[in-house]
């Protein structure tokens, strides 16, 4: 029997091994119906974490095997987005190639039929200095402050619309639009810029694939798309952390940035589409999908993380019809 910990009108949170569930009991329900699989699998860390992580070739083989499971769940124009952190060789100040080898194996899995649509880099200044031995003790490496985010699909043209994730114009661009003139002509790059190339107001500028939800340059504001900012700036995260404290839970140590989840949900799906997270943890993905009126399915092995994820949906501001225990 499928173990549903809780559900809302839009989604369900399952407890169990995601590979087993998606190969068997959930396969029929989800096959060909998922528009976006967004997840952050356990990273190949050298120290064992409570939320689970494998090492070396065992990790790589396991990671590659996920591709064929996920691929058959997608709609014809669906997407897989995976956040994958960096790894280091044990007891050496040398970065491991394991994440890249795993990613290449995943994309090239002959039973999955995937291709890499685009690579993103997510800058996170809140990450602790790591690996600590080489960054803070010996001081021979710099802080690892980003993760790679890989967007894949079964088609060259998955559903996507970057006009839904435009970021606010910079002050200089706003001034240019107001002034309706700029220095046109030939550039050192040999590109010729016409007098009207940049005078149309499209409501914002196209996001780059380096995602700054906090600005790298502290003298400049982080220009987050307004619809993403409104989700990430809600009081829901504060509510979640407060409830964890009140109920004696230690919050999941590797919680997903809501801005990151929301960006890809807005970019790659529409209201009513189905979003899946096979490694849901405290269910940031399901929470962001709920806010944006997407259907969602989340799966997690650790009951403790499932229990604390309930707090996200008990937030009165969300107004979800939550049902717990089946």
Q: What is the predicted role of each segment?
A:
Residues 305, 314-326:
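Conserved phosphoryl-transfer catalytic core
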Residues 2-308, 321:
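Core catalytic lobe of class I
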């Amino acid at each position: 029997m499928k173990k549903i910990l809780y559900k809302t009108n839009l989604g369900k949170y399952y407890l169990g091994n995601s590979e087993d569930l998606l190969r068997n009991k959930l396969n029929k329900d989800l096959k060909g119906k998922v528009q976006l699989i967004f997840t952050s699998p356990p990273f190949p860390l050298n120290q064992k974490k409570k939320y689970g992580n494998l090492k070396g070739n065992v990790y790589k083989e396991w990671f590659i095997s996920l591709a064929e499971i996920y691929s058959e769940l997608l709609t014809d124009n669906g997407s897989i987005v995976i956040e994958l952190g960096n790894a280091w060789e044990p007891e050496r100040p040398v970065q491991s190639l394991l994440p890249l080898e795993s990613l290449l194996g995943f994309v090239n899995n002959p039973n999955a039929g995937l291709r890499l649509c685009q690579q993103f880099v997510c800058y996170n200044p809140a990450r602790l200095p790591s690996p600590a031995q080489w960054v803070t003790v010996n001081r021979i490496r710099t802080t690892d402050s980003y993760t790679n985010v890989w967007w894949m699909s079964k088609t060259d043209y998955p559903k996507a619309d970057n006009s839904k994730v435009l970021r606010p114009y910079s002050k200089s661009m706003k001034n240019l639009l107001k002034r309706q003139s700029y220095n046109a002509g030939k550039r050192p790059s040999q590109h010729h810029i016409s007098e009207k190339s940049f005078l149309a107001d499209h409501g914002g500028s196209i996001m780059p694939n380096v995602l700054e939800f906090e600005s790298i340059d502290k003298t400049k504001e982080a220009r987050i798309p307004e619809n993403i900012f409104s989700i990430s700036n809600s009081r829901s995260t504060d509510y979640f952390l407060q409830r964890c404290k009140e109920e004696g839970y230690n919050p999941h140590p590797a919680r997903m940035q809501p801005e990151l989840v929301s960006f890809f949900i807005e970019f790659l799906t529409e209201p009513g589409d189905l979003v899946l997270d096979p490694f849901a943890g405290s269910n940031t993905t399901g929470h962001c999908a709920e806010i944006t009126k997407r259907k969602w399915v989340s799966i997690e092995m650790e009951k403790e993380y499932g229990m604390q994820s309930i707090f996200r949906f008990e937030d009165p501001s969300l107004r979800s019809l939550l049902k717990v225990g089946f």
